[in-house]
Amino acid sequence: MIAIVVSRADSASEHIGEHLLDLGDWERRDDPSRPDADGGGTYYRTDGFELREFDDLHIYLDDPAAAFGGGAGDETNDAASDDTDETPEFLAFVSRHSGETGELLTAHVTGNFGPAPYGGEPDTLARAAPGAEKRVVEALAAHAPEGYDVGIECTHHGPTDTSVPSLFVELGSDEPQWTDADAARAVARAVLDLRGTDADLVTDAGETTDEIDDDPHPRHVVGFGGGHYAPRFTRIVRETEWAVGHVGADWALGELGAPDANRDVIEQAFARSKANVAVIEGEKPDLEATVEALGHRVVSETWVRAVGDRPLPLVERLESDLATIDEGLRFGEVVPASPDAIRVRGLPEDLLSRAQGVDADAARVAVETNAVAFDTEQAGTRAAGSVAFADDEVSPGYDDLVADLAGVLERGYDTVDITDGAVIARETAFDPELAAKRGVPEGPAFGRLASGESVEVDGETIAPADVSRERTNRFPIDSPTDSAAEPPTEPSE
């Protein structure tokens, strides 16, 4: 069950709450066990959600989760006892966003990296709901009225002591937007789209990403640095397979103080995001050193994008055996049965280079289609160096890659043949030397002959075939027997 928190002290929150009740098939109930001001009295239930109203602003509520899960003494429904004391999966605070940011729909998690002027405790971070934040941002983007931007914000304000994960879903940024019915309804729709969502990131198959990776950390990243509206971390949320937990913007890090002296707060950012990796915006060597001393890893946005949904143990193995992602490692479409079931070898350098010259995009597709991973150069744009194949009987391998690269060459050559030890490509092409011997002047006439047109020189017609020569190009490859004999890579220590 997802707990929706509406504040009567926030007109935008009430407005969103009205649309939530209008959009859903809610059952009205009564909880006499707690004051109306604290979420008691009338509350609402529908499949997957419970909605309660509180008098205080959200940021000053200590732990509203305690109010949810059905009310003791609720006699409005015979089935009420079935969900009494049900713990919410997470809290969704529907709220206004205030600022000079115009039409904006946002989501963020809460906490204070330093002082607590707007609720919660100082130096304390709440339990984040990165998976829910990712899903609600996706839903906000789908439902946002024309003209509204969508993104995430950094971690800020209270509450900090919620007993379950939480997030804010906000409508901003001033009175015209808070009273905008279309925008409030968009936020309500986005919140209802959270039905069935876990606080942590889950796959399309409903598995948490830590279950897939056999790792205690889901695909969550902690963010440090940058501005309040966190454009880099919004990109990660919206454009990658990863979710973002706590984000300490530059202003929050300024309030935090020296990283090494505040290791406990930095560790909270990881523990309460269920994350083990961080992306740091800008040069912050002291912060990076502290993060690594705490046993976590600093990665780049490129790393997050490149890894995508690949199994993390496989990524670790490939970064050890080939290269790191920041050094140029990129991934193909093949996923082996286990991290140890890979075979690392050199790419067919000359063949690959020529195929890239014929059609760079097709050559890249050929490598990606057959490989588990491969090294690159030129900022990851050009495959080069080593390649890892799956070591099994059914996955594509070196010979399949050679065949696909040879297929790319067919677009630029008359014939292409794969032999034992080489790919042989033949072409009949314009020969400037032969043309010069026939008296053809350099310039436009050369270009016409090279394009397949005849030219006339001193009254003589010279056809392209008259000044063409057959060329044979040999691109070395490993023979099939060499390919079959290549041993699998030994497991890393």
From Swiss-Prot:
Entry's cofactor comment: Binds 2 Zn(2+) ions per subunit.
InterPro entries documented for this protein: Deacylase_DtdA_archaea, DtdA
One GO BP annotation of this record: D-amino acid catabolic process
Documented EC number(s): 3.1.1.96
Basic and acidic residues biased stretches: 22-37
Tagged with keyword rRNA-binding: no
SUPFAM superfamilies attached to this UniProt entry: AF0625-like
Superkingdom of origin: Archaea
Region (Disordered): 22-44, 441-493
Enzyme class, UniProt record, top EC level: hydrolase
Keywords noted in UniProt: Hydrolase, Metal-binding, Zinc
Reactions catalysed, as given in the entry: a D-aminoacyl-tRNA + H2O = a tRNA + a D-alpha-amino acid + H(+); glycyl-tRNA(Ala) + H2O = tRNA(Ala) + glycine + H(+)
A GO term, aspect molecular function: D-aminoacyl-tRNA deacylase activity
Cofactor(s) the protein requires to work: Zn(2+)
Family: Belongs to the DtdA deacylase family.
Assembly: Monomer.
NCBIfam families (alphabetical): PRK14866.1-1 (NF011435)
Role this protein plays: D-aminoacyl-tRNA deacylase with broad substrate specificity. By recycling D-aminoacyl-tRNA to D-amino acids and free tRNA molecules, this enzyme counteracts the toxicity associated with the formation of D-aminoacyl-tRNA entities in vivo.
Protein name as annotated: D-aminoacyl-tRNA deacylase
Organism of this sequence: Halorubrum lacusprofundi (strain ATCC 49239 / DSM 5036 / JCM 8891 / ACAM 34)
Gene encoding the protein: dtdA
